[in-house]
UniProtKB/Swiss-Prot annotation:
This is Hydroxyacylglutathione hydrolase. One of its GO terms (biological process) is methylglyoxal catabolic process to D-lactate via S-lactoyl-glutathione. Keywords: Hydrolase, Metal-binding, Zinc. It comes from Xylella fastidiosa (strain M12). Its EC number is 3.1.2.6.
Amino acid sequence: MRLTPLPAFDNNYIWTLIAPDGRAIIVDPGQALPILEAHSKGLIPTAILLTHHHADHIGGVPELLERWPTLPVYAPHDTRIALNYHRIGEGDSLNILGLRFQVIHTPGHTHSHLTFIGNDLLFCGDTLFSLGCGQIFEGTPTQMLASLQRLAALPIQTRVCCGHEYTLSNAAFALHVDPTNTALQKRRQQANAMRLAGLPTLPISLESELNTNPFLRTAAPTIHAATATHLQRTPIDEVEVFATLRHWKNNFPIKNIP
């Protein structure tokens, strides 16, 4: 299977897993055009997986269903997803094109957000980003931290497939919080070179994220110290460390909003 991120909008990725015969699993098609263009080159849509209800992740589905009316769509139970689809949730599993994916509920960015895990791949929508995490639009910091901790416990070789290309803007904040992290410094340099070459910085290994993403390192002494300095007091617990980081990032001069 070939894993390919298709750019959409300014910074979205539509993820595709393509079999040798062209049949493909499509994750979060916010636009139809990238899929239609890929179809002209041999891609055959076989199933759509949706992580959450936001338009930049599901907006292309109606047009794709007009073209392929029997195309199965799998998405969370959410009345805001106005589609004919298979409702799935925590504990479900999907078997598509010989691949098995576990479905886990990762609330925080939205109440019903799902993540798909399988074949050493993690399709996490707007829960986990390269060097960052999604904003908390509907959930709580406690929920979002718990969701991220579930993802952090996966095998370190897992490849993280995020919904947006935010690595460089996230790196600016991460280095502000954790400036002496040499692995983070190296990642920023590598990401900058990749973007200058027109390449995606994703997927990225979970191991790399665990070493460099401040939102996955809330128990690390350096991150705890940085948030204490920012708050001008000692954080109460790890949830407050996380909530402080998220609020800090929301107001950081260089940012992207999913």
